[in-house]
Curated annotation (Swiss-Prot):
The gene is MPC3. It is a multi-pass membrane protein. Mediates the uptake of pyruvate into mitochondria. Negatively regulates ABA-induced guard cell signaling and mediates drought stress responses. Keywords: Membrane, Mitochondrion, Mitochondrion inner membrane, Transmembrane, Transmembrane helix, Transport. Abundant in leaf and particularly in the guard cells. Signal peptide: none annotated. This is Mitochondrial pyruvate carrier 3. It comes from Arabidopsis thaliana (Mouse-ear cress). Belongs to the mitochondrial pyruvate carrier (MPC) (TC 2.A.105) family. Induction: By abscisic acid (ABA) and drought stress. One of its GO terms (biological process) is regulation of response to water deprivation. The chain crosses the membrane at residues 19-35, 51-67, 74-90.
Length: 108
């Protein structure tokens, strides 16, 4: 039974014999790096980088569900990229607009 499931995975159109498996698998590195950046101070985050990570995640999440065969590996990594990008953008916006505004009011 396990052998037949492994054989089905191996021969799948988006299986390990194709770029459709390996590209999303290596794309996890971007999401992992973005998660590692959760520890960085928000002032070091880049708006353009996080906007691109979020946008890429959203676009490819949608694409991965409309292609045939559906590529769930691509969907999951893209969703992860979108979520981590949104989180980082939220941190950056809070730092730049909420905390900065509060510190200006406190100084006055």
């Amino acid at each position: 039974m396990a052998t037949s499931k492994l054989q089905a995975l191996w021969n799948h159109p988006a299986g390990p014999k194709t770029i459709h498996f390996w590209a999303p698998t290596f794309k996890w590195g971007i999401s992992i790096a973005n998660i590692a950046d959760f520890q960085k101070p928000p002032e070091t985050l880049s708006y353009p980088q996080q906007i691109v990570i979020t946008g890429t995640g959203l676009v490819w999440s949608r694409y991965s569900t409309v292609i045939t065969p559906k590529n769930w590996n691509l969907f999951s990594v893209s969703l992860g990229m979108a979520v981590t990008g949104i989180y980082q953008l939220t941190r950056k916006i809070k730092h730049d607009y909420v905390y900065e505004a509060n510190s200006i009011v406190a100084k006055e």
